[in-house]
Design a protein with these regions (language model features):
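Short alpha-helical DNA-recognition segment
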Residues: 57-77
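DNA major-groove recognition helix of helix-turn-helix/homeodomain DNA-binding modules
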Residues: 87-104
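Recognition helices and adjacent regulatory flanks at domain boundaries
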Residues: 48, 61, 103-105
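N-terminal flexible/basic segments that precede or flank functional cores
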Residues: 1-50
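Alpha-solenoid HEAT/Armadillo repeat architecture
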Residues: 24, 38, 57, 80-83
Length: 108
């Protein structure tokens, strides 16, 4: 019988998994992470969506998916950057996580 080598995870995967673990059960940290992601990457919405996905996984993705009212295929497309979410979808996603979309003036 041939031995199969265990595949090493990439550092990015290890980091993301440890971040998910760190964010579990800490809503203040989840909020700070999302806020920083959006503020520091305002010109790259895909980074914010990846942060939202990370928080959703920290809270339990299956339960999160049910709360959004969106089907899993739609969520997969949004989080894999296959499709830009409609505003309505983004509002549902944030609402399922206990957040809301707000607008503030840019700092000069």
């Amino acid at each position: 019988m041939k031995k199969v080598k265990a595949q090493k995870k990439s550092p990015a995967v290890d980091y993301r998994e440890s971040l998910i673990e760190e964010l579990k059960g800490d809503e203040k940290a989840q909020y700070a992470y999302l806020k920083a992601s959006l503020e520091e990457n305002s010109d790259m919405p895909e980074v914010f969506l990846k942060a939202v996905e990370t928080v959703a996984k920290a809270r339990g993705f299956s339960n999160f998916a049910k709360k959004t009212g969106l089907n899993r295929e739609n969520l997969y497309r949004i989080f894999s950057n296959e499709r830009t979410p409609r505003l309505e979808s983004l509002v549902k996603i944030l609402d399922a996580l206990g957040f809301k979309l707000t607008i503030t003036p840019k700092a000069s």
